Amino acid sequence: MILNAKITSADIFIEDHGVLTFMIGIETSAGWSTNIGGFYLDWTDKEGNRVPAPYTSTVVRAILETVGVRGWSDLVGKYIRIDDNDIYNSPITKIANLMKDNWINIRDFMEE
């Protein structure tokens, strides 16, 4: 189902186990709240160093451009459209600008 949603939080952070990730909190027009994200933005190389995943800058930029903002902190308070995949408890990966038909599937960037 396609729903409108307000972005309530937007964070890029290092999880407890050392992985760089992002989380975007939303409140939907259906009355429920959830988070979008949790994908790895980095991993460990052969030498044991944390290095950016090849898609990191691409996915961050795609999210910013889709929502229509220039900075990650500017996401908060913006409205988007989401596709909940019509599956209960399925992660939200498809977002679009509220006024434009420019959908992205965040998961697609992770599979490149």
Predicted features along the sequence, with ranges:
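Short beta-rich binding modules
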Residues: 1-112
